[in-house]
């Protein structure tokens, strides 16, 4: 990457390369560099013409910055319900990622008769993301609990009790849990120390496979994570860089009755 950059950038300039560029071709880097150099020349020209303090350049809108940072071939598309924002993003994608132009879709609320959030069941998904319990495809579940010090995720078989081999049932359930936990960490923006209680497995190779599956699922997470080996008790300790406050903090308040304890003490038993 450094060799390519030395070829495409002028010696008097420096660049910061984002992680998303690790698989970029030399042509793509050259195109992006040319765009940035044109932008810089435009800024310099504006500076020369300015007679006093003036705005020379500003970052694009938040929506465009999110598209720039996050949108890639992994996404099926972007749906926008604001006409001006749709035009802005469609123009941006057309300029810098024209191969993705057909993935930008406009949602006409008036014509559809439903808001974008209603049609895409966004509110429903947010409610699910705030629940402590998450169901797995085979009938097992996750229970996600937050404490002051860390987040605990408990894996349960639930309805998935299997019909023959208990070890295979537990192994299969843990594999599903590994995928879903990685998804929930991103969806809920959970950071800090996280302890995962996978269901106990007797076969060491199964433990290794579950941990590898979990690490592979986490590899799609742009937020830095560190995962430690699974213990004899089936516990996995990990850390995830805390970027924001998390979904729960943004959408919930501490219960004024129990003050966040989740229980009510029966004081009549103490009298």
Feature map (PLM): residue ranges:
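Conserved glycine-centered short motifs in functionally critical loops
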Residues: 9, 15, 36, 136-271
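OB-fold/S1-family RNA-binding modules
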Residues: 1-142, 147-148, 250-271
């Amino acid at each position: 990457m450094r060799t390519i950059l030395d070829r495409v950038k002028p010696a008097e300039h420096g660049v910061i390369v984002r992680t998303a560029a690790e698989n970029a071709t030399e042509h793509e880097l050259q195109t992006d560099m040319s765009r940035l150099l044109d932008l810089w020349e435009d800024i310099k020209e504006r500076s020369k013409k300015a007679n006093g303090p003036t705005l020379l350049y500003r970052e694009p809108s938040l929506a465009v910055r999110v598209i720039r940072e996050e949108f890639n071939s992994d996404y099926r598309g972007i749906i926008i319900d604001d006409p001006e924002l749709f035009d802005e993003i469609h123009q941006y994608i057309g300029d810098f990622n024209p191969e993705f132009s057909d993935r930008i879709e406009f949602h006409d609320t008036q014509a559809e008769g439903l808001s974008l959030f209603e049609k895409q069941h966004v509110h429903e998904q947010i409610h699910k993301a705030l629940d402590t319990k998450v169901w797995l495809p085979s009938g097992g579940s996750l229970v996600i609990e937050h404490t002051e010090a860390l987040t605990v995720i408990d894996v349960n078989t639930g309805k998935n009790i299997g019909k023959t081999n208990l070890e295979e049932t537990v192994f299969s359930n843990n594999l599903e849990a590994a995928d879903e936990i990685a998804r929930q960490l991103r969806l809920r923006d959970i950071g800090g120390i996280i302890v995962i209680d996978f269901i106990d497995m007797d076969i060491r190779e199964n433990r290794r496979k579950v941990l590898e599956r979990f690490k592979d699922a986490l590899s799609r997470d742009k937020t830095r994570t560190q995962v430690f080996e699974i213990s004899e008790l089936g516990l996995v300790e990990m850390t995830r860089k805390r970027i924001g406050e998390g979904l729960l903090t943004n959408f919930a308040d501490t219960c004024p009755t129990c003050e966040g304890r989740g229980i009510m003490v029966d004081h009549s038993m103490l009298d």
